[in-house]
From Swiss-Prot:
Keywords: ATP-binding, Chaperone, Cytoplasm, Nucleotide-binding, Stress response
UniProt function note: ATPase subunit of a proteasome-like degradation complex; this subunit has chaperone activity. The binding of ATP and its subsequent hydrolysis by HslU are essential for unfolding of protein substrates subsequently hydrolyzed by HslV. HslU recognizes the N-terminal part of its protein substrates and unfolds these before they are guided to HslV for hydrolysis.
Designated gene of the protein: hslU
Location in the cell: Cytoplasm
Signal peptide interval: none
The protein's name: ATP-dependent protease ATPase subunit HslU
Entry-linked SUPFAM superfamilies: P-loop containing nucleoside triphosphate hydrolases
Domain of life the protein comes from: Bacteria
Record text on subunit structure and interactions: A double ring-shaped homohexamer of HslV is capped on each side by a ring-shaped HslU homohexamer. The assembly of the HslU/HslV complex is dependent on binding of ATP.
Species for this entry: Ralstonia pickettii (strain 12J)
A GO term, aspect molecular function: peptidase activity
GO biological process terms, semicolon-separated: protein unfolding; proteolysis involved in protein catabolic process
Binding positions (ATP): I19, G61, V62, G63, K64, T65, E66, D256, E321, R393
């Protein structure tokens, strides 16, 4: 993304993928813009400006996770989505909350490595070409004559041209490539991720520097050598420093299902452990330093977006200290028939476009009539009201059921055009959507 995207531009970008929920989009757009604003502020004050964390409240399937995911993609920032229910209080068996930052650091290193390798790709391609040409046309030994070098240069240029045009792709060559580190998958007990990671990194260093001779096609060798040469050109220490800085300044953590760790006063049971997870989250959200294998990472400027349906609990059931760490609260609306219709037609990768593309591969042209789309939206909305409100995810079930027979026999219908109108939808779905017992199990 352009770093100078205004909040309205961010919202219009999110509109391409998520229907409605303008309040939530507005809140995350402002949060993202504030990061850029903070970078423009002078140093003593800049350190004092911390992100305002967001709490999204709304039923499942209305776009909470998708908003956070698209925002991270837009910002090109390290992003991690985790369920709050996965964590246990320190001292209990299970994952502790510090692993959130460690996982985010891993994500940032991977992201930064990809970005750095893209920058040196042109140089890496040239070096890979030269290594393949050295195998195809070994360079002459220097015996004091200038003439053979010219001939070799001409032959080399000819082969280089053929290589670039793909004429040598199927030719088999033998060359030396780096031997990968021995693959060791170590399963550690819950809560011992640090120790497991240290053992894994210890074994990862064993195979470094070793070379293997392998036979492979030129096309396969070229890809392998590009990665190898790019890895040589990338400075690992700088890369790790950039990744750590990226996590500290731009990291986004999406805490899903936060309502499931809220203590409900009328219920007894495992409330101690729930409150313990909330207390463990507190320093992380407020700002602390976490030790990772890439160095110490401060969480002061990481943006936390929490979400929950809050069916059985309320935001006020969270411990007061944690409530205070999420000053921006946004309620997301349930989806209406009009929203469902827009989801099916207006988003960039709508379900209708996906099914059209899938069936096109079999030679079937799928056409969705306006009345067919409205009927689908009405059925999805009706089943959500009668059975269980699972939001936009209901459309997956409805669409699969609608196109089940067509998808199964698509290879026999090649060259045909199938129109999905209201009559087609009613023929296949009206009995199911009308019968509450059937829709409970099928739709």
């Amino acid at each position: 993304m352009s770093e100078t995207m205004t909040p309205s531009e961010i919202v219009s970008e999110l509109d391409k993928h998520i229907i409605g929920q303008h309040k939530a989009k507005k809140a995350v757009a402002v949060a993202l813009r504030n990061r850029w604003r903070r970078q423009q502020v002078g140093d003593p004050l800049r350190q004092e400006i911390t992100p305002k964390n967001i709490l999204m409240i709304g039923p499942t399937g209305v776009g909470k996770t998708e908003i956070a995911r698209r925002l991270a993609k837009l910002a090109d920032a390290p992003f991690i989505k985790i369920e709050a229910t996965k964590f246990t209080e320190v001292g209990y068996v299970g994952r502790d909350v510090d692993t959130i930052v460690r996982d985010l650091a891993e994500m940032a290193v991977k992201q930064t490595r990809e970005s750095e390798m893209k920058k040196v790709r042109a140089k890496a391609e040239d070096a890979a070409e030269d290594r393949i040409l050295d195998v195809l046309i070994p360079p002459p030994r220097d015996i004091g004559f200038a003439q053979p070098e010219e001939k070799d240069s001409t032959a080399r240029q000819t082969f280089r041209k053929k290589l670039r045009e793909g004429q040598l792709d199927d030719k088999e060559i033998e060359l030396e490539v780096s031997a990968g580190a021995p693959s060791m998958d170590i399963m550690g007990p819950p809560g011992m991720e640090d120790m497991t990671e240290q053992i894994r990194s210890m074994f990862a260093g064993l195979g470094q520097g070793k070379k293997n001779r392998r036979k492979m096609k030129v096309s396969e060798a070229f890809k392998l050598l590009i990665d190898e040469e790019a890895a040589k050109l990338v400075n690992e220490d700088e890369l790790k420093q950039k990744a750590v800085a990226n996590v500290e300044q731009n990291g986004i953590v999406f805490l899903d299902e936060i309502d499931k760790i809220a203590s409900r006063s009328e219920y007894g049971g495992g409330e101690v452990s729930r409150q313990g997870v909330q207390r463990d989250l507190l320093p992380l959200v407020e700002g602390t330093t976490v030790n990772t294998k890439y160095g110490m990472i401060k969480t002061d400027h990481i943006l936390f977006i929490a979400s929950g349906a809050f069916h059985l609990s309320k935001p006020s059931d969270l411990i007061p200290e944690l409530q205070g760490r999420f000053p921006i609260r946004v309620e997301l609306d349930s989806l209406s028939v009009e929203d469902f219709r827009a989801i099916l037609t207006q988003t960039d990768a709508s379900l209708t476009k996906q099914y059209q593309a899938l069936l096109k591969t079999e030679g079937v042209d799928l056409v969705f009539a306006e009345d067919g789309i409205r009927r689908l939206a009405e059925i999805a909305c009706s089943v959500n009201e009668k059975v269980e409100n699972i939001g936009a995810r209901r459309l997956y079930t409805v669409m699969e059921r609608l196109l089940e027979d067509l998808s199964f026999h698509a290879h026999k219908s090649s060259g045909e055009t199938v129109t999905i109108d209201a009559a087609y939808v009613d023929e296949r779905l009206s009995e199911l959507s009308g019968n509450e017992d059937l829709s409970r199990y099928v739709l």
